[in-house]
């Protein structure tokens, strides 16, 4: 059964882990409303209390359709609880096909929503400083939501702007001035990161490891070698916008008002449109040039600031979907302000999903699916639970993964990706009536690398994979 949290609320599923704690899905037994609960252990690090206090203050300032909604917080002893929207659509990276990207029409839609959210943040003097696909969530209507304000800061107050000097973010997404300069303006840094996200959506890969002279791919970009990957996969109109967004000099970089006037940003792209451009120039070895998206690169050794370098070194906790209830409802008040939190945490809350009291109709698998985060990394098997489990373990062991049985029906897989970065993901075996579901969830590392590994495992297990489509639609 689900674990009681506050009166009428149960913790039913783990959504993600982070450096200081985890995010759980809380569901109201009476209304079936869902909220993401970020549970932070304040004793994990000396700077944790101050960082969480800052994150809460910034979240309180935010109110925009493209920003994950913050409902409130409460503290019990050394545990801090943050209550946020539950975004059932999952993370943006899950919509990006490795080395391919996504349809240009979809990329444009998500990019427009991203720019709307970033424009709002800048209008109230806040910079995010860690924009990447893993921090961009989707609700049930595919509305993009910017999440994770752990590295965000205020750069303008009462009309007075300050320069930033803190080296933070995720290396492939950071602007070059963060590496080169001791002080820099906030706005252009977020614009640069948005450009890298757009590149990932259109090409399914990142352009470089880091934006400096030691990276050949970045030097090629500055030399305008657009016949190389990933640029050769991007049509001329969006590439022209990227050239303006990924301009090395921040003073020459395009601003958000001008992005909104750009031809590609404003044009109506027909569904299914496939465009190509004539490419001239030399050839390249794509296996050498391919730069996968990853989010766990340590950039501390680049810091030249007196401020402590802030790293985004783990898979961000998924927050997340636009709530339909009144934010002043007694149910939310009870969750945020109520008494009697149960501190008995389940050993493996993911496995309690099917037995939770949140299910409105006993035995209804559809209600279960309505509470699952939308992901493409899951499949049904056509064998029983025991055979599914043994097949998974045998396959992953042969493929060289480090296996750890976390608890009943959950396995943690660890490996290194093609760039020698740590990759950890969990596999839950879920029994649904006469069906067995293998649900893969990224815990730490790069989203696209995780998807590559999932596809390889699925292919190896092809003999037991069912052709039945997994709900909800992906």
UniProtKB/Swiss-Prot annotation:
InterPro entries named in the record: Chk1_catalytic_dom (IPR034670), Kinase-like_dom_sf (IPR011009), Prot_kinase_dom (IPR000719), Protein_kinase_ATP_BS (IPR017441), Ser/Thr_kinase_AS (IPR008271)
Any one GO molecular function term: histone H3T11 kinase activity
Alphabetical list of Pfam families matching this protein: Pkinase
Sites where the protein binds ATP: 15-23, 38
EC number of the protein: 2.7.11.1
Region entry Required for nuclear localization, spans: 367-474
Record localization: Nucleus; Chromosome; Cytoplasm; Cytoplasm, Cytoskeleton, Microtubule organizing center, Centrosome
PROSITE patterns registered for this protein in UniProt: PROTEIN_KINASE_ATP (PS00107), PROTEIN_KINASE_DOM (PS50011), PROTEIN_KINASE_ST (PS00108)
Mutagenesis / variant outcome for changing residue 356 to A: Abrogates phosphorylation and activation during checkpoint signaling
Region of interest: Autoinhibitory region: 360-474
First-level EC class: transferase
Effect caused by changing residue 377 to A: Induces hyperphosphorylation and enhances kinase activity and cell cycle arrest. Abolishes interaction with CLSPN
Gene3D superfamilies, sorted: Kinase associated domain 1, KA1, Phosphorylase Kinase, domain 1, Transferase(Phosphotransferase) domain 1
Region annotated Interaction with CLSPN, chain positions: 1-265
PTM entry text: Phosphorylated by atm in response to ionizing irradiation. Phosphorylated by atr at Thr-314, Ser-344, Ser-356 and Ser-365 in response to various stimuli that cause checkpoint activation, such as hydrogen peroxide-induced oxidative stress. Phosphorylation impairs binding of the C-terminal autoinhibitory region (AIR) to the kinase domain and thereby enhances kinase activity.
GO biological process: chromatin remodeling; DNA damage checkpoint signaling; DNA damage response; intracellular signal transduction; mitotic G2 DNA damage checkpoint signaling; negative regulation of gene expression, epigenetic; negative regulation of mitotic nuclear division; peptidyl-threonine phosphorylation
Phenotype for residue 377 to E: Enhances kinase activity
Phenotype for residue 162 to A: Abolishes interaction with CLSPN and kinase activation during checkpoint signaling. No effect on phosphorylation at S-344
Reactions that this protein is recorded to catalyse: L-seryl-[protein] + ATP = O-phospho-L-seryl-[protein] + ADP + H(+); L-threonyl-[protein] + ATP = O-phospho-L-threonyl-[protein] + ADP + H(+)
Effect the entry attributes to changing residue 344 to E: Impairs autoinhibition by the AIR domain
The record's note on its domains: The autoinhibitory region (AIR) binds to the kinase domain and inhibits its activity.
Function: Serine/threonine-protein kinase which is required for checkpoint-mediated cell cycle arrest and activation of DNA repair in response to the presence of DNA damage or unreplicated DNA. May also negatively regulate cell cycle progression during unperturbed cell cycles. This regulation is achieved by a number of mechanisms that together help to preserve the integrity of the genome. Recognizes the substrate consensus sequence [R-X-X-S/T]. Phosphorylates wee1 at 'Ser-549' and cdc25c at 'Ser-287', which creates binding sites for 14-3-3 proteins which activate wee1 and inhibit cdc25c.
Subunit structure: Interacts with and phosphorylates clspn, an adapter protein that regulates the ATR-dependent phosphorylation of chek1. Interacts with apex2.L.
Protein name per Swiss-Prot or TrEMBL: Serine/threonine-protein kinase Chk1
Gene source species: Xenopus laevis
């Amino acid at each position: 059964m689900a674990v009681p949290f506050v009166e009428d609320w149960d913790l039913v599923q783990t959504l993600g882990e982070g450096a200081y704690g985890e995010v759980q899905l809380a569901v109201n037994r009476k209304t079936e409303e869902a909220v993401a609960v970020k549970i932070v252990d304040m004793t994990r690090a000396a700077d944790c209390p101050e960082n969480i206090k800052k994150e809460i203050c910034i979240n309180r300032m935010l109110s925009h359709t493209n920003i994950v909604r913050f409902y409130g917080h409460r503290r019990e002893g050394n545990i801090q609880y943050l209550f946020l929207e539950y975004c059932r659509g999952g993370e943006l990276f899950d919509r990006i096909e490795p080395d391919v990207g996504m349809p240009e029409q979809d990329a444009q839609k998500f990019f427009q929503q991203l720019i709307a959210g970033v424009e709002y943040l800048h209008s109230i003097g806040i910079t995010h400083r860690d924009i990447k696909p893993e921090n961009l969530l989707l609700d049930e209507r595919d509305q993009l939501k910017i999440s994770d304000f752990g590295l965000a800061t205020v750069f303008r107050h009462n009309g007075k702007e300050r320069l930033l000097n803190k080296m933070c973010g995720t290396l492939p997404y950071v602007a070059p001035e963060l590496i080169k300069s001791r002080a820099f303006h906030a706005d252009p840094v977020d614009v640069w990161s948005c450009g890298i996200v757009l590149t990932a959506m259109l090409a399914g890969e990142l352009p470089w490891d880091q934006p400096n002279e030691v990276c050949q791919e970045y030097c090629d970009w500055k030399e305008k070698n657009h016949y190389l990957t990933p640029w050769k996969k991007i049509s001329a109109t969006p590439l022209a916008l990227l050239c303006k967004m990924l301009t090395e000099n921040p003073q020459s970089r395009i601003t958000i008002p001008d992005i909104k006037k750009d031809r590609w940003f404003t044009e109506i792209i027909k569904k299914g449109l496939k465009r190509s451009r004539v490419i001239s120039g030399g050839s390249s070895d794509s296996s050498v040039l391919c730069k996968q998206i990853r989010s766990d690169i340590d950039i501390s050794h680049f810091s030249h600031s007196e401020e402590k370098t802030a790293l985004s070194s783990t898979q961000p906790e998924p927050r997340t979907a636009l709530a339909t209830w009144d934010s002043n409802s007694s149910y939310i008040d009870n969750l945020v302000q109520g008494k009697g939190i149960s501190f008995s945490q389940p050993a493996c809350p993911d496995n309690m999903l099917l037995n939770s009291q949140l299910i409105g109709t006993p035995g209804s698998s559809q209600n279960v699916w309505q509470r699952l985060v939308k992901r493409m990394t899951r499949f049904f098997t056509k064998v029983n639970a025991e055979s599914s489990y043994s097949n998974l373990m045998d396959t992953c062991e042969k493929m060289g993964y480090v296996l750890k049985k976390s608890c009943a029906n959950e396995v943690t897989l660890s490996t290194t990706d093609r760039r020698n970065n740590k990759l950890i993901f969990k596999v839950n075996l879920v029994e649904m009536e006469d069906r067995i579901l293998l649900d893969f969830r990224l815990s730490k590392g790069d989203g696209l690398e995780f998807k590559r590994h999932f596809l390889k495992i699925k292919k190896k297990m092809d003999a037991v994979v069912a052709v039945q489509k997994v709900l909800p639609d992906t």
